[in-house]
């Protein structure tokens, strides 16, 4: 962008903030270059989520001094290996890791029914690198209940169903590419980390990740699913060529996993918006994919209205109750992937799916045995 264009966009954002014009802010988040810088994102992200000063103060008043919580050890381990890709000096590294532990501890101590998953810390660290703690904490809590709650259940149910929706979007937008993927027996596990971390785990350039966060926070939760699908759609030619070369599902899966590293973020957002126009959210068969009526994908209204229209904690509890009822229903067929629950206890379930995803990729790096010795 030219200096004149940057200045004009800054002024447009500042005026929208002064006028509480969230519709204009949402439009900017979906178009062009987003919100540009930390100083603007601090106010814009909070405004787009409908977070009041009172709500922020309530979050900050919560204590972290009470007893331990279910996944405290895992949170500590994830915090200790976080921020490494951003080349911070030792002082800032210690500061941010301490803040990350505190932020996640506040959330999980206050809401013990939530299940931590490995990958949530990737989202949290972007918030802490972009916002002061006073803004990052309430925003994290908001995202947990209005954007990420499907991933915070004690089974893989919500996560797997969202992964399946990625293929549904590809099928609706590009049936030919969809058929190629199905014939190659490609599942959407390659997109697992994209989906549950909002690409923060896969993209090392923080400016690109923040631009994606601008887009996602300005939009409906289904936008993340569509963006995952769009990454695949934008690489259809290379994918089909790999299949024509008989490269095999293993090589293709490995190729797909690495796609986010080279995305053109503004072009990706533009193309995703075009796909949303061509395949509206309302046309996506959520019922066919058994998406819970309490899922965040069922949010109605604009993003800044979610808190006033619904109670995220209540919806999470209803989703949890529905899951437990389904689990104990006679004759219910439990997908094989859910049997991992016998191995991983409740709060570790979504960490388990990350392990499963990593295992799928790792297995492709092991040479297959041959008959020659």
Curated annotation (Swiss-Prot):
Keywords: Endoplasmic reticulum, GTPase activation, Membrane, Transmembrane, Transmembrane helix. The chain crosses the membrane at residues 343-363. It is found in: Endoplasmic reticulum membrane. One of its GO terms (molecular function) is GTPase activator activity. One of its GO terms (cellular component) is endoplasmic reticulum. It is a single-pass membrane protein. Its main location: endoplasmic reticulum. Residues 35-220 form the Rab-GAP TBC domain. One of its GO terms (biological process) is vesicle-mediated transport. Pfam families: RabGAP-TBC. PROSITE patterns: TBC_RABGAP. Has a role in vesicular trafficking and septation during cytokinesis. This is GTPase-activating protein gyp10. It comes from Schizosaccharomyces pombe (strain 972 / ATCC 24843).
